[in-house]
Amino acid sequence: MAAVDDHLVRLDAGLLLLFTPPFDDTVLEPGYIKGYVPGVRENGGQYTHAAVWTVIAFAALGDGDRAAELFALLNPINHARTPAGAERYKVEPYVIAADVYAEPPHVGRGGWTWYTGSAGWMYRAGLESILGIRLRGTHLVIDPCIPQAWAGFRVAFRYHDARYVIRVENPHGVSRGVTALELNGVALGGQAGVPLVNDGGSHDVRVVLG
């Protein structure tokens, strides 16, 4: 992951590349990716599937600051916050682009939209890897990996007809590490997660990091 940070993350351009440098005039043939011009799609551009997996990897390593930073970098709305940014990006800022160009004169231009499976991966990266909320059978496993500066967050989760309001507190400014888990004011101790019941009621879940 250090190599990814060193060679593939371009914060100035808002890009997370698939690889670098792109294939151009090479003796050996790497396959179909050379059919794209350098810096476009799989040929050294940002290929968003792999970029999102980088977010998931940093969260798995416990680096909530980097995971959230790269999640924001990939968020399409951040590519169009200014008129200049929107002109450069050119595609819709409210859907995930499958790719973003990485070579002049089209650095930062969005590619194909509305069809990429990386949109689903982006959703999972935010919900499961950063907020740490995962459904496992009839249990809700909560293991956030968030920026240290976050004081916490709140999520309302619906399980059939029941509602679970999850409050995560981060009093010590850490990225990961659950020290307390409560359901309706009762400590759950060593349980693997929050047991879910479809009772039509509302339940409070408290998670403390430390």
Question: Can you describe what each PLM-predicted range is?
Answer:
Residues 1-210:
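Acidic, mature catalytic/reactive cores of soluble proteins
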